[in-house]
Amino acid sequence: MSDKKRINQIAKETGLSNTELVATAQSLGFEVKSHSRSVTAEQAEKIIQGVKTGTDTIVKPAEKTVKAKTKTVPETAKSKQEDHPRTFAGKAVVEDPAILARIKEKEEAKKAAKTEAEPIEEVITTEKPKVAEPVKKSEPKAAAKAEETKVEKVEAKAKTVTPKAEVKTENVADKKEPVVTEEKKKSLTQKPRIQIKVIKRAEDIKKEQAAARPEKKKFDKNRNDRNNRNDNRRPNQNGNGQGHSQGGNHYDKNRPAGQGQNQGQKRDKFASSGSSSTSDTFTPAASGKNNRRDRDRKKTDSNRDNTKDGNRKGGPLRVNDNRNQVRNARNSNWNQKGGRGRYQNNQSSNVPATQRKFHELPESLEYEVGMNVQDIAKSIKREPAEIIKKLFMMGTMVNQNQSLDEDTIELILMDYGVTPLKKVEEDKSDIERLFVEDGYLNEDKMVERPAVVTIMGHVDHGKTTLLDRFRESRVTEGEAGGITQHIGAYQIKTNGKKITFLDTPGHEAFTSMRARGASVTDITILVVAADDGVMPQTIEAINHSKAAGVPIIVAINKIDKPGANPQRVTQELTEHGVFPVAWDPENGSEFVEISAKFNQNLEELLDTVLLVAEVQELKADPSVRAIGTVVEARLDQGKGAIATLLVQQGTLHIQDPIVVGNTYGRVRTMTNDLGRRIKEAGPSTPIELTGLSDVPQAGDHFAVFEDEKAARAAGEERAKRAQLIKRQNTRRVNLDNLFDTLKEGQTKSVNIIIKADVQGSAEALAASLQKIEVEGVKVDIVHSAVGAISESDISLAAASNAIIIGFNVRPTGLAREQAAQEEVDIRLHSIIYKVIEEVETAMRGMLDPEFKEEIIGEAIVRETFNVSKVGTIAGFMVIRGKVTRDASVRVIREGVVIHDGAIASLKHFKDDVKEVGNAQEGGLMVEDFNDVEIDDTFEVYKMVEIERKK
């Protein structure tokens, strides 16, 4: 058997189309239905040769049978058959040539009989229509017997014929008999042998239908044509000549007699009353299967007609299409004016439903960073979509609620021709601006205020004693060690005028407190002891006052002492830029010699203060919200955070919402310097208040806000910023400080937790401890706060291995018990220099001890003894010093140290001894060393601890 090939494979090899190959194969009689079928090599050659040479199609056996019966076929019929091939289900349908010849003859007879058929048509139209009588089944069969016998053979082989073939067969049967004769005019009522079909002219039918149709109603012409065509395809027996357009009964074997009449009545609305042209035809009996096939075929034809007419460009418009157009017009015409209703949108209108007024663009726009598209659109009265489109064209995709940056806002405003002006946002949390802002105070409401005087000077020069004389109280007696620990604010009245005094510590640890005191003061009283003269803190006070631009009044104190020398003090002050008024009238300072202990010249000093204050013309506005500075702050167990404030501008009232430093609250209580509760405090008034959420820092500013909500927001924002700054100041390891950091890993540190009574003392103590310089040890302040020592402080100290230092505070009972359990060291002090001295001593003791090598003896090896399982024993003689058991030894050979180790054993003769003296012999073993030779030298030494120099 030869190899087979598929048609598509042959097409690829030869370059021919699959369709040509399949058609040629079928014409050659091969059983090939598609290009996927296989053929032999011989068949393939025949197919290819047939395609190339154009071989005629071989007739199939069914066609041969028909052609055998055909003797002569006219050329016209043959050409007609070739021009219009009839197909059914994609297959060729073979027709009898005799039938085609008869069809041609009948068509010629039809043309000749048209003139004779017109009088008959008029007679029929004048007669009264008669009801069609049921036609018996045998009559049409007898009438068309001859034609059936001819068509039977074709039907037997083709089995199924298209509706067009049926129509042609019926027409042949109709046209076989004479169409018009005089005898048939007389015998119209008689039963004819063949039914005559009288057809009206199509032009007349169209005119009558157009005249009977209403003007506003438009029907589909193609649908009427389809109905007529379908009626012609369903011939019926009607005795009165009425067709389907007027309700003619369609003959069906499986349908009741009255059903066709009802269907004709339903179709009556598509035809006019004058259209009475009908056709009484017959059809051969068909089975139920054929009827179903006919109905399916009619539906297919109807759908095909719809597709050809309505869905093709240029086809007639249907009623449904009209309705869709109206609906689309209603949806698209959204801006036409009209009321609600089904037909309102059909009314045309040129006025839009919503007309947006034209708004002119502003010349400039003050914008804020973070505005969105919707905000900008409202400001310039434009649609957000328009702005979004502009931004999209600029390469920025945003929505109307998205925040825009500064550059984008300016870009879109400039695109519209609007000048962008950035709105300067007022930082409400920045309370420092209120102290320098010009518009905050009302010039017309300014009144004279008391002067704020700060007393400064070196430690133990009499500052607190002087202030005590002013207040006529015994403040100094309450100070531990006679040293002022923290700042105090007091107000006195002399000659009808008030003066506010601030007392600052004189110890070197309180530098920051003196600087804060100078920043809020109007006048500085520099106290200098006449017997001591100018000291380091005196110079520091001078520098602080000059930096703040504050006038200085020099009070030379202790002039009552025997060694007092005011002239020497004046000379020393001039060396630091402080000159008496007699020496420098313009920039000179007032010098007053006083004795605070004996109340000497104090009134003169107060008069000098009032004189200098009057020259300065100190004023304030009591009508605004209060602002000022924190003098001191502390934590009380019962009252909470307590802050000493100095009001500088405005008036402070009870229940005022206030922001103090990085904390906030509401003024709960206010007390003056005498401990009395007050309801308001004016400018230059020192007060002590409660109600804050946390303890502020000394030197922080405070300001009163309009409501508590704003105060809370400002306080939280300031706390957040302070935390951020603290994090930024935290030292980070980088390549620059990596080596230093690694070196610090060898440095020991002492962890300290500081708890003090006031914030200023805690700050000063922390600064002083961090200044302690001991090589190899540093101070690490783990925590610093105000208030009593609590359980949380003990837990923190235990976790960080820290020492707790309490300054003027005591631990609670529970904290003391917990400290005993955790073995936490608590040191309580009330004098700052004692704290510093104690911590410095502890830091020096934390250092590792220093050792120095001390040579105690020297010996020479005289003999060596090797003992199994023991090692080498060296016999030696001490030539200098001594050899001890607890010492170390170096083995030196020819001036080179070959081993350095400990002595494992030491003997004098056979006895174990602790030492061998000078000029004595003995034996020893060097630990982990057996390579000892004669004449080696033993250098015996010890590491002696030496005391660290302070």
From Swiss-Prot:
Ranges for region G1: 457-464
Annotated tr-type G domain residues: 448-619
Protein biosynthesis among keywords: yes
A Gene Ontology cellular-component term: cytosol
One MF annotation (Gene Ontology) recorded for this entry: translation initiation factor activity
Keywords: Cytoplasm, GTP-binding, Initiation factor, Nucleotide-binding, Protein biosynthesis
Region (G4), start-end ranges: 557-560
Sequence segments annotated as region (G2): 482-486
Taxonomy, superkingdom: Bacteria
Annotated protein name in UniProt: Translation initiation factor IF-2
Region (G3) location: 503-506
Compositional bias per record (Polar residues), positions renumbered to this chain: 322-336, 343-352
Main location class: cytoplasm
Pfam families: EF-G_D2, GTP_EFTU, IF-2, IF2_N
Annotated GTP binding sites: 457-464, 503-507, 557-560
Cell compartments where the protein resides: Cytoplasm
Skewed-composition ranges (Basic and acidic residues): 77-86, 128-158, 165-186, 200-234, 291-312
Family to which this protein belongs: Belongs to the TRAFAC class translation factor GTPase superfamily. Classic translation factor GTPase family. IF-2 subfamily.
InterPro entries: EF-G-like_DII, IF2_II, IF2_N, P-loop_NTPase, Small_GTP-bd, T_Tr_GTP-bd_dom, TF_IF2_bacterial-like, TIF_IF2
Keyword Cytoplasm assigned: yes
Job description of the protein: One of the essential components for the initiation of protein synthesis. Protects formylmethionyl-tRNA from spontaneous hydrolysis and promotes its binding to the 30S ribosomal subunits. Also involved in the hydrolysis of GTP during the formation of the 70S ribosomal complex.
Annotated spans, G5: 595-597
Region described as Disordered: 69-92, 128-352
